């Protein structure tokens, strides 16, 4: 989720989780036929800030002998990036590795020293790992049991949702409850990344309702900086804050904000600019694994899914025009 996705799903004690397991997913399945646009907003709700920073958060340890020696920066092999759309900036190697690394524990260890040295991109991507793996790592046994229960329901999207959750389980398998991956940690890492200069992290904080500054001038300036950057991760991080939650705000981008279509347009623009919106990417996986919002076509990417299920035919032209406007301006350095 946060997203590249952000999310604010609450962590529950394992006992409570286990006791309500089947009924919870039964309700989710029953609601699967409701308006997808509203469900998309729910799945992408930004992370909530903690009431106060916890000084004794348990961070994933730098070295765990039982989990292998993965502390070096070269521990995750470089993976060839997918081709970006024409005119879009190529994704950084760290972003490509986040999307494609089969072991996110090893990936997190490989970029830890760079994050500790204050590199904004490394801190931001650590927050993405923590967000992606938080639900699994808080209770791996219960998570696996839920996955089996969902698959056993044999509903139209059961197989897709079970598959997405299995991808999360596989990639996050070496994280454990004692690592303390929760959404307080995600929020604190994103504050750290934003203060270090990460535009996607800064955008995610604005989308969560906890911007670095609370003035309308700051908000308008940040939206403008994201637009000029043409950074797909910044677009994706900002998208939840550009939907109906921004209705009525004054800014130079008001025509590109304040409606349900606006949120989708920002995310679709991120896809065009090079965000991994493929069927197995983190965006589609998080929608499906965390929110039960899954395509029945296992090969369908985010754009195909949205146009099929979330945008009425008469609204497609409006969204197309918004996306064109969002990606049309020339990229400028930040």
Positions of PLM-derived features:
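Extracytoplasmic intrinsically disordered, low-complexity "stalk/linker" and propeptide segments
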Residues: 72-117, 123, 137
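Primarily a tetratricopeptide repeat
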Residues: 109, 188, 221, 265, ...
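Terminal, low-structured helical/coil segments at or just beyond the last alpha-helical repeat
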Residues: 276-334
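Hydrophobic membrane-insertion alpha-helices, especially the h-region
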Residues: 25-42
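Short helix-capping/linker turns of helical repeat alpha-solenoids
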Residues: 116-123, 130-133, 137, 145-178, ...
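Juxtamembrane proline-rich low-complexity "stalk" or linker regions positioned immediately after a signal peptide
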Residues: 9-14, 47-89
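N-terminal, positively charged topogenic segments adjacent to a membrane insertion site
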Residues: 1-22
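Mature extracytoplasmic/lumenal regions of exported proteins
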Residues: 244-298
